[in-house]
Design a protein with these regions (language model features):
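N-terminal secretory signal peptides that target proteins for export/translocation
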Residues: 1-6
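Bacterial N-terminal signal peptides
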Residues: 8-20
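N-terminal "domain-start" segment that seeds a small globular fold
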Residues: 22-49
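Short active-site neighborhood of thiol/selenol oxidoreductases, capturing the structured segment around
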Residues: 48-70
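Hydrophobic beta-strand anchors of alpha/beta hydrolase catalytic cores
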Residues: 58-59, 90, 140
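Structural microenvironment flanking redox-active thiols in thiol-disulfide oxidoreductases
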Residues: 70-113, 124-130
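Thiol/disulfide oxidoreductase modules built on the thioredoxin-like
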Residues: 113-116, 123-171
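Non-globular targeting/processing and membrane-anchoring segments
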Residues: 172-184
Length: 184
């Protein structure tokens, strides 16, 4: 039997998740059908979404000063181990300018958090602002195998790590199971 404290706690979690999902898409902001994404990674490579067609893509936007971003990166790194053998690509994009956080500091931040997927910088927020008119971090954008945005864009890590990973897992698995235009 669930006591009153447990009921209140479960209700609060459910309300938090429902409100977060309802607010995930920025009001009045229409998502781009084919987002433009050509960003240089800290590894020197240029990452272009057009070249990633055929894979599901998870892009996490964040910043070194964002505490929930750090927690989210740990959760995403754990998810990455589950999807390593599948056509899923993970990326982390810092929205900080070089004068705010140097490349060396950004590399150190990623290394300290054991981030094994590519780290990039969107200094002018040109990619970031395609999905939202204001800064809310962390922000996750999922793209299907055809490079189309899978709405809603998700802001913040709205739940405990296990619940968050379960939600991301559900969305990734749905995208993996959906055939691309070329597979139909």
């Amino acid at each position: 039997m669930i006591n009153v404290t447990e009921r209140v706690f479960l209700f609060a979690i459910m309300l938090f998740v429902v409100c977060g999902v309802a607010q995930a898409q920025a009001p009045g902001k229409e998502l781009p059908s084919d987002p433009l994404f050509k960003v240089q990674g800290l590894d020197g490579k240029i990452y272009d979404l057009a070249e990633l067609r055929g894979s599901v893509v998870l892009i996490s936007f964040g910043a070194t000063w964002c505490a929930p971003c750090s927690t989210e990166l740990r959760a995403l790194e754990e998810l990455l181990t589950e999807y390593r053998e599948k056509p899923v690509k993970f990326y982390w994009v810092s929205i900080e300018r070089p004068e705010e956080t140097t490349n060396a500091a950004l590399k150190r931040y990623a290394k300290e958090r054991k981030v094994s997927f590519p780290v990039m910088r969107d200094t002018g927020k040109m990619v970031f602002l395609q999905f939202t008119p204001r800064v809310r971090l962390p922000m996750i954008v999922l793209l299907d195998k055809d490079g189309k945005v899978d709405a809603p864009v998700q802001f913040g890590m709205r739940a405990l790590a296990d619940a968050y990973k379960a939600e991301m897992r559900m969305r990734l698995n749905k995208l993996l199971a959906t055939p691309s235009d070329g597979e139909q």
